């Protein structure tokens, strides 16, 4: 079963707030993993995304692993709104919507 994970942090940020508003609008409830309070969450995010960018959303399997290895980033490219297949970090509203549709979390 496909699951939607969202990495967050305790002090929040505008991108995290935007993602939450969009997910509320889309009536989706992700599994939130807080990198400020959950050590494993920070480690997983570093391993998968290569940085601690929040929010990062992951299309995951039952074990909460990405459904496929994230696509690599081009050298020196920021992660903001880059759809890397199974993950997207700091998405815009349109980027998040496209990611959710592609993975079947949201109807087109």
Report residues per predicted region.
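Thioredoxin-like thiol-disulfide oxidoreductase module
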Residues: 34-52, 60-64, 98-106
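Conserved residues at beta->alpha junctions
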Residues: 10, 36, 90-91
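Non-catalytic, surface beta->alpha helical segment in thiol-disulfide oxidoreductase systems
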Residues: 61-108
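Local sequence-structure signature of Cys/Sec-based thiol-disulfide redox active-site neighborhoods
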Residues: 1-32
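Conserved short-loop catalytic and cofactor-binding motifs
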Residues: 7, 33, 45, 84
